[in-house]
Structure formats: C-alpha cells, structure tokens
Amino acid sequence: MLKKNCLPLVIGLLLGVAAPLAATAKDYLRTCWHQQGQSLQASCLTLNYRETVNELEHNAAPWQTTAYTGRGTVWTNAESFGKQDTLRAAARPRTYFSSTQWSPATLLFRDYGDQGLFAATPGLQQDYTFRAARYSPVALLAYFVQHRVPADKTALPGLVAYHATINETVVSLFIRRHDALLDHVTLLSPDELLGDVSTTFTYQNYAEAAGVRYPATIRIAKANGQVQDEVSIEAATSQPAAPMLLAPPPGYQLRPAAATQPEIRVERFRPHLHFIELEHTNDRVLVVEFDQFLVVAEAPLNSANGELILREARKIAPSKPIRYFVAGHHHPHYLGGLRPFVHQGATILYGAGSGPYVAYLAAAPHTLRPDSLQRDPKPWRGEEIRDTKTIADGTFTMQIFCIGAQSGHTNDYLVYYFPSEKLLFEDDLVGIPRQGPPGKASARQAGLYQAIKARGLAVDIVVQSWPVTEAGVKTIIPFVELEQSMK
C-alpha cells in the first residue's frame, strides 16, 4: 500500500508523462509527406500509367458518357509535375496527344488535338496543384506541408483530415491513422451548370519505388459521383530530373483571366416572335409573346445568362409573366440557364426522359457561386413532353413536338412549330452552308426533315438556335434548301 505522502509524487509523475505525450501528438501530415514525397528533393518520381476516362459530352441522354482509354508518363516531385500521354476514344479510331508541364509559378499545356500551347490563366495554373493528384498526390501534399495546414479535429473514424482552399476549390486530404498514408482527396469546385461539384481521388494498392510510397491504383469519382474513372500505375522509378516536355515561348506569361462581356442583340422577327442573340455564347434565344404571358425557349450554359435573358424578356413585354421555359434538349447550350426561370416561377418544359436530370439541375446547391435560386430557394415545376404540347391563347398557337431519337442527336429532342407563320424553330440539327448549294444531308438534318414530313407540318422557314454566326452555316433556312439536301 502506498503511503499518503507518496500520492502527490505518483500523480505528478502521471501528469508529467501525460503532458509531453499531448504536446508531441503525431503529425500525420508530415509523416505522410515523409513517406510519399520528402525524399524527392533532388529527384523526381516517374510513373508509367494507363487509365480509363469517361467524359460527359454532347451525348444522347443525360449522364451518358463517352469512354476513352489513355496511356502516359508522369514526372513529379514537390516543385514540378509533367505529363505526356495519349487518349483514344473507344468508339473512334483516333488517338489524341497532350503534354503538361507545371510548377508553382508556371503552366505549359498542349491540349488533346491542339498544335499550340493553351493560353493558361493564373487560376488554371493554381488548379493544377490538385488536378495533378489524379495521377500522384506528391505536389498536393507538398502544398499542404508548405502552408502548414492544420488537422481538422472532426475527422472521420480512422482518418485525419486537412482542408485548404486553392483558387475556388475546397481541397481536403484524408490520411489513414494506422499507417499515415493518404487515403483519399476530395475537391469541391464550382461548376456553372452542375453547381457545387465534388471529385474524389481514392488511393489504393500502395507500392514503393526508390523509398517513396505511391498508390498503384487511383479511383476517381467525379461529377458528384455520377462518373467514374480509374488510373493504374504500371511502373515506377526515380530519376534525377524530369525531361523538358514543352518550351515556353518568348515573353511567356500566364494570361490574366478576362471577364466575359455579354453582348446582346434583340430582334422582333415576327409580331409574336422575338429573338435574343447572345453573341458571347453564339446562341439565339426564342421569346414567344402571347396575349397574357411569354414563353422563353433556350438559355445557354449558366445562371448568369439566364438572368440576362430574363432581363431582356421583361423589356419586350414588361407586364407579361414568363409562364413557360422550354429547352430543346438537355445539352448545356439550351438548358444551362434554367435556374433563374425556376426562381421566377416558370413551368419548365422538357423532352421525354429528361425529368430527373432537370430536377437535379434545379435542386443542385450553388453555395460556391450563389445564384438567385441559391439565395432565395423556390420549388420547381416541370412538365414532360413525350409527344406534343400546344400552347395557345385564342389568337396565336405554338406547338411543341418531341421528335426524340429521330433527331439523330438526343433522345429528348423538342422542336417548336408555329402554324400561322409556317415556321419551325430547332436547336442545332441543320448544317447548310452560307455559301454554295446545300450538300448531302447529315443524319441530324435528315432526321429533322423526316420528322417534319411525318407530322404533316407546312414549313416555309427553319430557324436554328446555335450557332448563330460561327461554323459558316445558315441559321435562317428556307425549307426548300432542306428539301434539296435530301436529294
């Protein structure tokens, strides 16, 4: 049994041991860096990889991806990242090449299919600190160590978290407690269409080369988990220095980011039909004026453009509410600006099968770049058009037809017909050149012609939404020229 006068000594000894332990709590970030990159001070880690890439492109259905396979080599350390690679589309027999050379002060980038360097901005250069983590987290770990990012005390079980904001992206590292290796990285970035978008790089199957631990498998979940990619490291070595992949041109500097200046032209095309042309996006928006209300068709890319269109529509008819907003199909040039119309209480019209995607866009958080719907949330109202919808007020009629896959473009494709004008408005199906006779109709062009004929529509003129001026094609098209292209 301990004597009473020994108790203070025992308690003091216990406290004396406990205090140093608390003061020297493990620094998981530095321990991780020590294993995964610190030894690369005078050398670089060289990684040969292959990857599967799935991209959201202009496909037939929402969330449908285009599949690519890639191979390449990465050279990386704390102060540099280089990549030379090829990308091949699974459905097309063509190989694309790209090169990237990054440092904390520079970015040289030749994009797939380009001959010259991409004009990189300071924001894009900053973003490569975390973009490179798709292949290797070395540069990103170095950034967190150099900036002495503190640990988050509310980490998930078994993990220690660290958070930093780089440019506009919230970057989070999650390090495993049991071995102090990086488990995964999450990115939360603003996207003009999808809102707050998360991307996760999950690191698996750690191996070692030249004393550096690296993940041999990286699984990528992007677009809020809607799209999955994978990178597999096939070989890893260390070498004294990375090769010079790209040479900076004379006077090289990052291009300052320039704000887009919206240029708008409004035209009263017919008594009930108005066009709003957005020159900065090369789009034509249709405003249909009824006796008591308006219908707006198409809003390109983002909420900012949607707000511009709302403003111009109010100028056309200040006392008339916008009852409907309709997008010809689900691609960003037509649906991207829908959220301001949701905020204004318009009913959103969409083609067959696109309802869940439209609902997703309407409900998507936009906290990183708030728009009107984020600041003042409103419920959305929608209506699917599977066949035909007629909008009329007794004096003027608009018919909306879902031609879907017949368009040769998307499964939800809508066209707008005005019987009294013998006019049909569509998004992007016709490619008749401005100069010279019409060539042979493309699949899209033929699909539109056949859809018009199958429905018995009397059409004199076809008006196209995009492109208004680029690509050298007509966008106000006599129907006889569409007929000629079918011969």
Residue ranges of each PLM-predicted region?
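Gly/Pro-enriched, hydrophobic low-complexity segments
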Residues: 156-247, 414-419, 426-427, 432, ...
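Zn-dependent metallo-beta-lactamase
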Residues: 228-291
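Active-site metal-binding motif and surrounding structural segment of the metallo-beta-lactamase
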Residues: 304-349, 455-459
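N-terminal mature ectodomain segment of secretory-pathway/periplasmic proteins
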Residues: 26-117
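Conserved beta-strand hairpin/beta-sheet module of binuclear metal-dependent hydrolase folds
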Residues: 267-313, 413-432
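Bacterial N-terminal signal peptides
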Residues: 8-18
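Divalent-metal (often Zn2+) His-rich catalytic cores of metallo-beta-lactamase-fold enzymes
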Residues: 448-487
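Flexible, processing/modification-adjacent segments and terminal tails
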Residues: 102-171, 177-179, 189-195, 248-255, ...
